[in-house]
Amino acid sequence: MSSVKRSLNQEIISQFHYSAAEGDIAKLTAILSHSPSLLNETSENGWSALICDRSIVNKSRQTALDIAKFWGYKHIANLLANAKGGKKPWFLTNEVEECENYFSKTLLDRKSEKRNNSDWLLAKESHPATVYILFSDLNPLVTLGGNKESFQQPEVRLCQLNYTDIKDYLAQPEKITLIFLGVELEMKKEFFNYAGEISKEEEDGLVAWFALGIDTVAAEEFKQRHENCYFLHPPMPALLQLKEKEAGVVAQARSVLAWHSRYKFCPTCGNATKIEEGGYKRVCLKEDCPSLHGVHNTSYPRVDPVVIMQVIHPDGTKCLLGRQKRFPPGMFTCLAGFIEPGETIEDAVRREVEEESGVKVGHVQYVSCQPWPMPSSLMIGCLAVAVSTEIKVDKNEIEDARWFTREQVVDVLTKGKQQAFFVPPSRAIAHQLIKHWIGMNPNL
C-alpha cells in the first residue's frame, strides 16, 4: 500500500513539474490550491519546480539545458542558457593559489617614476654599466650559451650590450626606437671605477636596461660584426626558448616596440608624433590637438585583454578543447577570444565558448594570467563550467572541438606525442590551465 501511495505522490510531482516546464499557470494554480507543499518537492534529479542546479547531470549525462533543448521547451532552454553564474560546482576548489606564468617573471623593477626624468635617462644611456637589448622587426638579439662540448641543449640567452656597442645608433635618434625598461632588482652598492667616468656623487647604484629597435639594414650590419649573435625568429615558438626572467623582459620590450611601430601618427588628428617618457608615451606634434589636453589612452601603449578558458564538463570528468586550422596536426588547446568593450571577463568567457563550440557556460572562476607579446595581449586564464554538452562548432571560428576525458588528458601530459593528440607546451597558459584542472584530483 505504501509503494502505491509513493508512486501516486511521484506522479503528482511529475505532473506538477511538467506543468511548470510548460508554463501552464492555470494548471499550476489548481494543483497548488490542493497541495501547496509541492513547491518544495524535488524530482529524482534534485530539481524543484522553481529552480534547478544547471550543473547536475542525469544518467544519460544530460544537463537541464540539454533536456529542455531535446524536448523542445525553448522558453525554458532560453532561461537556463542565459542565466549567469550559479552555484559553484563541487569539483572546483575554493582557493586558487597565485602562480607566475612564462613571460610574467622579470629581472627588472620598471621604475616608472624615472620615465619623466629626462636628465636621469640621458645619464643612464651613456653609463658604462647600462644594459641594452637589441631588436629588429620585434625580434630580440640572442646568443647561445653553455659549453660547446657539452651534450646538453645550449641555452638561448639575450645579448646584453653596453653603450660602446650601440652608441652609433643613439647618434641617429630618427632611425631608432629607444625604450627604458627599468633597473635591475638588485642595487649595485659599488660599481667599478670605469676609469673615473662617473663621480661617486652622481652614482645611484641602479643598473638601467633599455630596449633598442633598429631597422633591418642596421641589423644585418650588426650581425656581420657579431657572428655569435642572431635575431630570434619566428617569434613563436622561438621566444619560448628564453630563460624565464629574460622572457619577461622581452615581453615588456616587444609589446612597447610593437605599439610604436603601429602608432607613429596621432590617432586623434593624424599628425606625426614624438616619443616621450622613456618610450611609454607618444605626443602629437600638432599644437592644437585635443590629445595634448588631459590624459588620453591613445597616447600610451595598449594592452588587449583576452580570455582563455578550460571548459569543464558539468560532471567534472571531461574538458573541452579545440583547434584552429593553422595549428600543427593533432594539437588541441583551450578556447580563447578577445574581450569586447563593456564586457566582463565572465561574460566574455560565456560568449566566446558559445560562439566557437555551441556549448553554454555557467560558473566562471579566474585562475591566473599571462602577458603574451603577440604583439601585446594579456591572457586571462579561467575555469568555466559547462551547463550544456552538445558541441556545434562554428567553422569560421575554429576547426574542431571535442570533449576529452581526464584519463586522456593525463596520458597526453605524461606521455606526450605518443598519444592521438597533444596540447600546447608548458610555457603556454593553456597548458597550465589544463594542468590546474587535472590537479584538482588529489590522486594525481
Curated annotation (Swiss-Prot):
Mg(2+) 2 binds at E352. Binds 3 Mg(2+) ions per subunit. Substrate binds at Y300, A336, G337, F338, E352, E356, E397. The modification N6-succinyllysine is found at K167, K274. The keyword Magnesium applies. The keyword Methyltransferase does not apply. Mg(2+) 1 binds at A336, E356, E397. Keywords: ANK repeat, Cytoplasm, Hydrolase, Magnesium, Metal-binding, NAD, NADP, Peroxisome, Repeat, Zinc. ANK repeats lie at residues 11-40, 60-80. Its EC number is 3.6.1.-, 3.6.1.22. GO terms for biological process: circadian regulation of gene expression; mRNA catabolic process; NAD catabolic process; NAD-cap decapping; NADH metabolic process; NADP catabolic process. Its cofactor is Mg(2+); Zn(2+). It catalyses: a 5'-end NAD(+)-phospho-ribonucleoside in mRNA + H2O = a 5'-end phospho-adenosine-phospho-ribonucleoside in mRNA + beta-nicotinamide D-ribonucleotide + 2 H(+); NAD(+) + H2O = beta-nicotinamide D-ribonucleotide + AMP + 2 H(+); NADH + H2O = reduced beta-nicotinamide D-ribonucleotide + AMP + 2 H(+); NADPH + H2O = reduced beta-nicotinamide D-ribonucleotide + adenosine 2',5'-bisphosphate + 2 H(+). A motif (Nudix box) lies at residues 337-358. Zn(2+) binds at C266, C269, C284, C289. This is NAD-capped RNA hydrolase NUDT12. It comes from Bos taurus.
